[in-house]
Structure formats: C-alpha cells, structure tokens
C-alpha cells in the first residue's frame, strides 16, 4: 500500500518513488490478467533483450498465465532464446489506443512439458510450427516483474508482480 506526500510517492517502508508515479497495489492474479488482456488486445508487443552490450527488439504475440505466472514462448534455436539464457533481464512493450504497457523483469526458462503444452493449448495456431516435445519449443515466465501502464493523458500506474 502506498500514499502520496508532497508530490512524492512514499511507500510505507519509507522508500521514495519519483514524483508523479502512482503505485497501485492489486492482487497478483488481477495484475497479470490485466497485463495479459492488454497484450492480447494489442495483438503485438515488442520484447527487448540484450545481445552483449547491444539492445535487440522484436515483435512477439504470445502471453499466457500458467500456474500464476506470466509466460511467453519462443524457439530454442532463435537468438532471443540465447540472449535470455545469457541475460534474463528483459522488457516488453505494447501500445493500443493511445495507451501502452511496459513489463520489465527477468524471464526465467521453464522446461516442463506441461508449461510448454499449456502455452500451445492457449495458442493453437502455434501447433503448426511447434509441439511440446519437439525439443525446440521454449517458454519463459516473468520473475520480479514491474508493469507500467501509461498514456499521453494520465500519470503512469506502476504495479509489481
């Protein structure tokens, strides 16, 4: 829970956040559902990773909640997979109707078959290219994530999950 004081956001533990940043505490399930709904409505989001000291950004379309975690999917043969294994810190961004969401955190690989299959069940069109047992399908979930909802007309809302 947070409150505002003198145009600063002061958390109850005494730490400060930048002025005009409002932090909203919600239950994690609601936060992830809101993030996933936004990503799906936007249809495309952009995933940023690091390739050494060079940033890399590419379009993605998968976002799925499995076992209370926000997952994305890629192929092990892709550069993005190698980049995430070398440095799990990543950020995604999607834009729709003058609003955008950014989610920053660590993307952790989950090599369990049930996690891969859950993603493929959520996105049947992927089953033309991937299967849970093909040795290539890979899913990652966000850990220590911060989602920032922004627009051109309102102050950002920051949520953590």
PLM regions: where:
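Charged, gly/pro-rich active-site loop segments
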Residues: 2-27, 102-161
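Short, basic, glycine/proline-bearing loop/turn elements
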Residues: 17-22, 46, 61-70
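A short mixed-secondary-structure module that forms the rim of ligand-binding clefts
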Residues: 63-97
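A short, Trp-centered hydrophobic/proline-enriched beta-strand micro-motif
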Residues: 37-52, 90-93
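Short, surface-exposed beta-edge/turn micro-motifs
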Residues: 42-44, 59, 68-70, 87-90, ...
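General beta-strand recognition
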Residues: 46, 70-71, 102, 148
């Amino acid at each position: 829970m947070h409150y505002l004081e003198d145009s600063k956001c002061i958390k109850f533990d005494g730490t400060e956040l930048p002025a005009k940043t409002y932090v909203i505490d919600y239950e994690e399930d609601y936060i992830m559902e809101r993030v996933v709904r936004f990503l799906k409505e936007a249809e495309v989001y952009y995933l940023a990773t690091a390739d050494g000291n060079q940033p890399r950004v590419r379009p993605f379309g998968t976002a799925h909640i499995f076992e209370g975690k926000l997952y994305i999917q890629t192929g092990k043969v892709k550069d993005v997979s190698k980049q995430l294994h070398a440095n799990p810190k990543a950020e995604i961004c999607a834009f729709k109707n003058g609003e955008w969401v950014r989610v920053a955190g660590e993307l952790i690989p989950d090599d369990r078959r049930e996690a891969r299959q859950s993603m493929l069940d959520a996105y049947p069109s992927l089953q033309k290219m991937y299967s849970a047992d093909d040795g290539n399908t890979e899913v990652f979930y966000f850990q220590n994530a911060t989602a920032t909802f922004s627009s051109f007309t309102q102050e950002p809302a920051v949520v953590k999950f």
